Amino acid sequence: LTTTSQNAHYLRFFSQDADINLTSLYANPAGSAFLNKGWHISASAMTAMQSRNITATNPAYLLNADGLTSANGTRTFEGDVFAPVIPSFDFAYVQDKWSVSAHFGVVAGGGTCEFENGISPLESLVAGLAYTNGLPGYTLDSYMKGKQNYFGLQVGGTYKILDNLSAYVGVRGVLASCAYN
């Protein structure tokens, strides 16, 4: 799944680098100094659906007896993704000239993709073995399921230097959680 949006509000406003808003903390954390004094909390979630089609051409695919290969040796491997909830959370505490803030969310990935008929690199290995050994054909029961979630955490502080200038110091980390079957 391809999602690098940081939060659901990004889908409505792509230029978050220049936005002064709580939901822009990931892209513009220094902007938190210009929010109203007090606590600011945001929780958002989005749902994502996506299809991935991999088209590969290999003359050896013609040996596969399943009938899914075109006359020129091209096969399409179709994968579907559904991520019901991709969350993000933003917090800021703002005073006169300073603020502290944090962001947590799924910053990339966010879903599980299933390829019911496998993927081209796996098929190419078997097809290549059948072809180089002169076999009349092959069958392959292949399946691939991959999950990728990249959780981002950012914590830091902002100081308002001038009425229209602030500086941010913080740390950002990403934890990858990936699995393939």
Task: Give the positions of each predicted feature.
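Outer-membrane beta-barrel porins/channels
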Residues: 1-20, 84-181
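N-terminal, post-signal peptide beta-strand-biased segments of exported outer-membrane/organellar beta-barrel
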Residues: 1-106
